Amino acid sequence: MRQIFSIALLLPLAAWPAAALADDPPAAEAAVLPAAVGAPRDVPYAGMIALRVTPDLDHHVFNVAETLPVRGGGPLTLLYPKWIPGTHSPEGAIAAMAGLTITADGAPVPWTRDTVNVYAFHVDVPAHAGSLKLSFQYLSPVTSREGAVVMTDRIALLQWWQEVLYPAGYYARGITVRPAFDLPAGWQYGSALEEQSRGGGTVTFKPVTLDVLVDSPLYAGLYFARWDLAPGAKTPVHMDAVADAPEDLAIKPEDLQAHRNVVTQSALNYASQHYDHFDFLVAVSDETSSGLEHHRSSENGVPTTYFTDPKKDIFSRTYLMPHEYSHSWDGKFRRPADLWSPDFNIVPERGSLLWVYEGQTQYWGEVIAARAGLQTAQQFRDYLASTGAELQAQAGRNWRDLQDTTNDPVINQRRPLSWRDWSRAEDYYMEGALMWLDADTLIREKTNNAASLTTFAQKFFGIDDGSYKEATYAFDDVVGTLNAVYPYDWAGFLRTRLDTHPNTALLDGIERSGWRLVFTDKESDLSKAGSALRKVHSFRFSLGLIAAGDGAVRAVSWGGPAYQAGLSAGVSIVAVNGTDFDADTLSDAIKKAQTTRAPIELLIHNGKHYRTVAIPYYDGLRYPHLERIAGVPDRLSDIIAPLK
């Protein structure tokens, strides 16, 4: 009976596949996509947008009220900025935009988010409406775990692209906005925007086009100071600073002069000024984080010791403010054609020339900082040594060329990387700077100092002095100007350094400048300052690791001794050769291993587990420095000599 039942049970199962085949559903097909948001047109938008931002200091929220003029009913698409100039990436803060409501004549107007382009909101405008009133909040990070903190009970750092919706279909320069900001009682502000009126705590600014608004951040604070960096000049330049505490704004006279020198040296380097006024916006704070370039201003976040104890903050003084200022010429006035976008959403940015936009700016930032006196010649050389050593040791240069790293802002958007040493990340800054040092020293050598990269900067960025209308360029324009300075195979020079891996010419500029990279067992003051700022101890060029004071491993060099021993970031060093870990103990162990030739034993803690690893490393402590090359002119000193 059991056997008969089993056979009967199997019969319909055996017959099932044939029946099922006859009734199979049709093959899957892709769903129809919604119509794409139309490309922007270079025509003016009728009317003026009124935009008002009110900070909620207790909750780190920016409240936005916007009035958008409309004509006639029908479909309208509103866009929240996605591609942010200066970040080179689609990192618009759409996830932090909340509470959107739209009304017309007091009645609610429904909206629908585009299911593909989530930065777009579709609205059916009522036929009778003359304007739409929009209300929403930008929920700024409350802690650094969520992102850069831009608001405290004493500081508010406002970037307008986080607080505006704009109509699709228009170039940003065709949309006019009248911005306003509700200034907390007792606060002051700095911005490139020009004040039109003030009443009841609300500051209303003169109308500007949307592209200018997005390019004009506002820094406000309870503790505020403003300094004239170009006294008596026809083109005003100021430094506007907000701070955690009033004492953080005490600047020494010689330090103020060094910042004034940045303005003077930059104008000489570029033989032009492409703004009608400029404001360095500075947040002197250990609580907030900021930094971005703009055409008539710059955002600069610095530690609370920046003015009061410059020796503690050597690291950020090596390039930061001159770098962001240089972007007014390199990146804002003259902009790579594929990075210029008519709006902030529909036309994506591409960064194929970031080695000019950021790489040459990085170079000039370091050079101008030295020329101005923000850093000493020794600090400049130490920074250069650190850069050269870091890139020389970087394993990722063996598989990935410099040109490909210009895609990183889109690929990664500065998210943390497990193995940055192997993957690489935005190396067009530092390796780009070394490439431009290479070009500078080559021009100086071949012309017997009759020309230099400053000559290039004056020709390339110095056109149309006084204009701040963007002028775009392509690779051939860069090559053409270099050839006008000194005829050479500049296309080959650049493409060799951009497209090969590894780039064996990495240190050519340093050596042609009359110096060479060497390693000793002494760490430079600049390196110590950088480590102190990050609260780590660097053994990058010896064991191939960086550790915090408590032994937590922050980074491991791909393929280095620590890597070969099985270490990675995230583990902790508990003991060194049987003694509790501290940086001095590890340093001593590295030194002793040179003589004893005995592997260095580390007790490693990872989660709930412990293990001991032995690292057979016997080459001692290694820290980078520059050493003079006899018989080669000291072109490096010529490069950082102040311009007259």
Predicted regions and their residues:
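C-terminal recognition in membrane/secretory proteostasis and scaffolding
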Residues: G365-E366, Q375-K644
